[in-house]
Amino acid sequence: MAAPCGSELPANSPLKIPKMEVLSPASPGGLSDGNPSLSDPSTPRGASPLGPGSAAGSGAAASGGLGLGLGGRSAASSSVSFSPGGGGGGAAAAAAAACRGMSWTPAETNALIAVWGNERLVEARYQQLEGAGTVFGSKAPGPAMYERVSRALAELGYERTPSQCRERIKTLRRCYSRVKEHGVGKRKSSYTFEQLEQVFGQGGWDAQPCQPVLINSSGLYQELESDGSTMEDYSQEDWGNHSQDLHGYPTDQELDEIPVTKRTLKIKQESSEEAQKRDIMQNIVQILESVQLKWELFQSWTDFSRLHLSNKLAIFGIGYNTRWKEDIRYHYAEISSQVPLGKRLREYFNSEKPEGRIIMTRVQKMNWKNVYYKFLEITISEARCLELHMEIDWIPIAHSKPTGGNVVQYLLPGGIPKSPGLYAIGYEECIERPLSPHMEQSSLDPGKEGRVDLETLSAQASLQVEIEPTRIIYCYLGIAEVRTLQQCLFLHFQANTKTFSKDWVGINGFLSQNCIVDPGVSPKSIYIKFVEVERDFLSAGSLVECLEKAIGYPLKFNN
């Protein structure tokens, strides 16, 4: 059981040294993965040096010339070490060792790499890419950096001082430089060359959105101790070959255990959602392009502190170009109908947000050259109008059987709000197109003359044309400002056909004419959709033009 730091052990308590990895004797010019300060072969790998200010350590050094240290870590078992030495020399050595820190377990090392990569990436973002194409600037990290790293490790369950973190980072950087320059490493490690390349090289570190994936330290220790190869040299290629075993990703065997049906269903669901998002974004891009807005170059954070962006709703787009192609392309487009434009744009240019992290990473990796934005300010009513178009589903209007000859009645659905708002009326359009080439060829093939193809005859008899998927055409946008949504729709659909006149125009005339049908012919399928809007907002904006830009064609009965 681990003892807390600073506690005293009974005099008759035997010192138990856990089975840990033993470092090789230091060799000139050779750097190992372990702490260089603990190169004494008599010192166990898991030795815990005396920490500064430790009462137990100072007492032991003064009385018996033995430096005792207790490591209180929550995620790794503590260990006790002893080393002979005089009182003064032992205290000095203990103080120096305390700065270097106790040996690091594989889990701690991987946590440190993940945390360090995130912290360095955050620091680089605030340097405004002064590295001229490099991921991290040349400025050395200061004490505040190691303080943040120490706190981050503590949140993951690893108690490490800033000094210990600094020494371990130095060791990792030396290991990386050795393999990078000479292509060899001293020994097997709990991390891969790719991990060090991300944090110390120019490849770029992808920030971890959540707690880093850590390695099973106990399992890794078993492997390292059992294969007897901790003293071998490994090339850079060997480092990369171990990456599959060291990363915490599911193996092929684990993936095969997932039922095929569930995996297929999930893929189909994700593809459907992605297709829907892509269609919405294309619609928003169409709106932005139709009003011919100019791209603005993103230069600094102060761009979005301007007052006129603070509380406005807008349609906005994020664009980019590359060093090879100056044309600006869309990365993302959105209708900011719930969140003010200024706040939403800051999220896309804030490296701490998921949206901003993607953009900054692509600029840092030189995938993009510059980032741009454009926006179109909209009113609340226009935002609700676009919501009506993109997010509200059509509701079909049923009709009764013909009564009194050739007249049908519309049957409005229940649940129409008794409140102000916007509503749209549309009708179903079936687009006919010629028979498919295969069907035409089979019907005209001279080689089949005199023979009866029952399948072809049946298909031609039941379907003379191929019908496109249902498309609903907008024909009217209504504003329920004086009356409620329920009252407005009732006036449109419950008009008395007996008072119908040929002079009627507009939406009421269209709906009334649709009620008069020839025998055996069904009327057009009519649809409605509506959204509630506060009455005070309905008078602002150009709602009809807004919807026409969104759908790409004029409303037939609003002009």
Swiss-Prot record:
<feature type="compositionally biased region" description="Low complexity">
    <location>
        <begin position="46"/>
        <end position="61"/>
    </location>
</feature>
<feature type="region of interest" description="Disordered">
    <location>
        <begin position="1"/>
        <end position="62"/>
    </location>
</feature>
<feature type="modified residue" description="Phosphoserine">
    <location>
        <position position="436"/>
    </location>
</feature>
<feature type="modified residue" description="Phosphoserine">
    <location>
        <position position="24"/>
    </location>
</feature>
<dbReference type="InterPro" id="IPR042792">
    <property type="entry name" value="MSANTD2"/>
</dbReference>
<dbReference type="InterPro" id="IPR044822">
    <property type="entry name" value="Myb_DNA-bind_4"/>
</dbReference>
<keyword id="KW-0832">Ubl conjugation</keyword>
<keyword id="KW-1017">Isopeptide bond</keyword>
<feature type="cross-link" description="Glycyl lysine isopeptide (Lys-Gly) (interchain with G-Cter in SUMO2)">
    <location>
        <position position="343"/>
    </location>
</feature>
<feature type="modified residue" description="Phosphoserine">
    <location>
        <position position="48"/>
    </location>
</feature>
<feature type="modified residue" description="Phosphoserine">
    <location>
        <position position="27"/>
    </location>
</feature>
<dbReference type="Pfam" id="PF13837">
    <property type="entry name" value="Myb_DNA-bind_4"/>
</dbReference>
<feature type="modified residue" description="Phosphoserine">
    <location>
        <position position="32"/>
    </location>
</feature>
<feature type="cross-link" description="Glycyl lysine isopeptide (Lys-Gly) (interchain with G-Cter in SUMO2)">
    <location>
        <position position="268"/>
    </location>
</feature>
<feature type="domain" description="Myb-like">
    <location>
        <begin position="103"/>
        <end position="173"/>
    </location>
</feature>
<feature type="modified residue" description="Phosphoserine">
    <location>
        <position position="13"/>
    </location>
</feature>
<keyword id="KW-0597">Phosphoprotein</keyword>
<protein>
    <recommendedName>
        <fullName>Myb/SANT-like DNA-binding domain-containing protein 2</fullName>
    </recommendedName>
</protein>
